[in-house]
A protein has these predicted regions:
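Active-site neighborhood of divalent metal-dependent phosphoester bond hydrolases
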Residues: 48, 61-149, 180
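Short, solvent-exposed loop/turn segments at secondary-structure junctions
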Residues: 25-26, 91-92, 163-166
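Acidic, His/Gly-rich catalytic cores of divalent-metal-dependent hydrolytic chemistry
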Residues: 13, 177-182
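Beta-strand-turn-beta hairpins that frame and shape the catalytic cleft
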Residues: 12-17, 151-157
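N-terminal active-site segment of His-dependent metallophosphoesterases
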Residues: 1-69
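Acidic, glycine-rich loop-and-strand cores that form catalytic or ligand-binding grooves
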Residues: 153-166, 175-177
């Protein structure tokens, strides 16, 4: 990990600081702790133009998936700190399942969807897609639909699962088939 005395291999515009958090997986308490640490760091080391980037995988596995989704869907979780939320493979599968893709629904149930549905107050063994849609707030679905694959800061590129070799970044950013997120 770089500290303030090491030279960075990339470049950010003057006054810009990036905070990046990956793979939250429904761990709301830990996310709150990380956000508090960022607030403390900004207080102790002010900077003109900070940004927070969540790198995807907000759902599945952890105990507070619905809470994490509610916090992120509500907008910038730290007042005054612009936030970018990226698409992870778990969000992609969840969204596809909620939009009626039966294969995605099956995959999702075996890769963390059970925990997600339980967090929303459902028994995944007893409920159908229509029940899922009744319990998952529309704001959470719209949040999922609005997630992007990658984000650039200076000459850094942030993505959940990496970059496809041999494909120009601009082509990847505009790529409509989000199922390629791994």
């Amino acid at each position: 990990m770089l500290n303030d005395t090491q030279k960075s291999p990339g470049h950010l515009p003057a006054g810009r600081r990036v905070y990046a958090i990956g793979d939250i997986h429904g761990c709301g308490a830990q996310l709150t702790t990380l956000h508090a640490a960022i607030v403390s760091d900004l207080h102790n080391r002010p900077v003109a133009d900070p940004v927070l980037i969540h790198l995807g995988d907000y759902v599945d596995r952890g105990p507070d998936i619905a809470g994490v989704m509610g916090k992120l869907a509500a907008g910038d979780p730290i007042a005054g700190l612009p936030t970018v939320n990226l698409l992870g493979n778990h969000e992609r599968t969840m969204l596809d399942a909620l939009l009626g893709d039966r294969a995605a629904a099956t995959d999702w149930l075996y890769t963390g969807g059970r925990e997600s549905l339980t967090s929303y107050g459902l028994d995944p063994e007893l409920h159908t897609l229509s029940a899922w849609l009744e319990k998952v707030p529309p704001a959470h679905i719209e949040f999922l639909k609005g997630l992007t694959l990658m984000h650039r800061e200076g000459n850094y590129v942030f993505a959940h699962a990496g970059i496809r070799p041999g494909v120009a970044l601009d082509a990847q950013e505009k790529h409509e088939d989000r199922k390629s997120v791994v």
